[in-house]
């Protein structure tokens, strides 16, 4: 059974089994880095199955949504709290920012809320992680371009 989170009253889309729904770019980069490091150390690509590929496509989709080129995207987060670093203003979407193809993140890797949504180190981490996905999928699936991730 799924444990009910202490954060179940957060004003976001909470589901059973989710502890907390704060989202940071690095949270999606680490599974990629782990996959890539494992593959480089072992040469074993058997772990890159359909479930792994589905997860990678979801990561790419999330990064694209959070570029916010076509609106705010589906993610928002609010919490009733006295701590400013624990919540996100303006309906849970954060302060306005001009879209520029960087990925928005309302939280830093420390779980503290951001004021400015474009965390350059986190975006660099994402670029590196996306390059690792490309290298793996070119090797395993013979993917040649970005269109393969849209299927």
Where is each model-derived feature located?
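Acidic/His metal-coordination segments adjacent to aromatic residues that form catalytic metal sites
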Residues: 2-22, 83-118
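Aromatic-rich carbohydrate-recognition surfaces in CAZymes
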Residues: 1-85
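Catalytic cores of carbohydrate-active enzymes
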Residues: 61-81, 115-119, 125-151
């Amino acid at each position: 059974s799924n444990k009910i989170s202490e954060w179940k009253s957060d004003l976001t889309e909470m589901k059973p089994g989710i502890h907390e729904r704060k989202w940071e770019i690095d949270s999606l980069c680490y599974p990629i880095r782990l996959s890539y490091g494992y593959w480089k150390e072992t040469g074993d690509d058997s772990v890159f199955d359909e479930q792994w590929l589905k997860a990678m496509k979801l990561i790419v989709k999330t990064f694209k949504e959070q570029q916010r080129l076509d609106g705010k995207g589906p993610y928002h987060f609010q919490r009733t709290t006295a701590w400013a670093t624990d919540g996100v203003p303006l309906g849970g979407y954060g302060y306005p920012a001009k879209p520029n193809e960087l990925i928005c993140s309302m939280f830093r890797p420390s779980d503290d809320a951001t004021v400015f949504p474009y965390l350059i180190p986190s975006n660099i981490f994402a670029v590196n992680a996306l390059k690792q996905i490309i290298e793996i999928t070119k090797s395993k699936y013979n993917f040649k371009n970005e269109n393969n991730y849209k299927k």
